[in-house]
Curated annotation (Swiss-Prot):
Role summary: Required for rescue of stalled ribosomes mediated by trans-translation. Binds to transfer-messenger RNA (tmRNA), required for stable association of tmRNA with ribosomes. tmRNA and SmpB together mimic tRNA shape, replacing the anticodon stem-loop with SmpB. tmRNA is encoded by the ssrA gene; the 2 termini fold to resemble tRNA(Ala) and it encodes a 'tag peptide', a short internal open reading frame. During trans-translation Ala-aminoacylated tmRNA acts like a tRNA, entering the A-site of stalled ribosomes, displacing the stalled mRNA.
Keywords: Cytoplasm, RNA-binding
Species per Swiss-Prot/TrEMBL record: Lactococcus lactis subsp. cremoris (strain MG1363)
Record flagged with keyword Cytoplasm: yes
The protein's name in its UniProt record: SsrA-binding protein
Gene Ontology terms: cellular component: cytosol
Coiled-coil parts of chain: none
Subcellular location(s) per record: Cytoplasm
Homology family: Belongs to the SmpB family.
SUPFAM superfamilies per UniProt: Small protein B (SmpB)
GO process terms (BP): trans-translation
Name of one Pfam family that matches: SmpB
Length: 155
């Protein structure tokens, strides 16, 4: 019996939501070799320091670590190599225009399988300042306290 792994995140970049304000997301395919996709299916991928750039009308993902496949022998490739992302031309043009602004970056948020293909959820993001991070933590804590009080009140 085949497990249903569709849209189940194989890797998430949790630090991205803390360090960046994400204002637009894109779903992109990723070009991988055979041994890389096998490692991705085993969830041996890290998105922590990843980012993407537009070069010559193509989007390239850098600094994403995919561990070498254990039985891959000579077919394994470099772990941190740049990988091509598959997006529509209109999306690439929009991303290129946004990235030309200052303080904007294009980062991977999660990797998942969709219809057997590896997909990367990418986000256009602006870096948060330290006081923004503290403010969002306070807001999150206040919301938790309110939810806790409502739960106690409704019992």
């Amino acid at each position: 019996m085949v497990k249903n792994t569709e849209d189940k995140p194989l890797a998430q970049n949790k630090k991205a939501r803390h360090d960046y304000e994400i204002y637009e997301t894109f779903e992109a395919g990723i070009v991988l070799t055979g041994t890389e996709i096998k490692s991705v299916r085993q969830a041996k991928i890290q998105l922590k320091d990843g980012f993407a750039r537009v070069r010559n009308g193509e989007v390239w993902l850098s600094n994403v670590h995919i561990a070498p496949f254990e039985q891959g022998n000579i077919f394994n490739v470099e772990e941190l190599r740049t990988r091509k992302l598959l997006l529509n031309k209109k999306e690439i043009a929009k991303i290129d225009k946004e990235l030309s602004g200052t303080g904007i970056t294009f980062i991977p948020l999660k990797v998942y399988l969709k219809n057997g293909f590896a997909k990367v959820l990418m986000g256009l993001a602006r870096g948060k300042k330290d006081y923004d991070k503290r403010e969002s933590l306070k807001r999150k804590e206040q919301n938790r306290d309110i939810a806790r009080q409502l739960k106690a009140y409704n019992r």
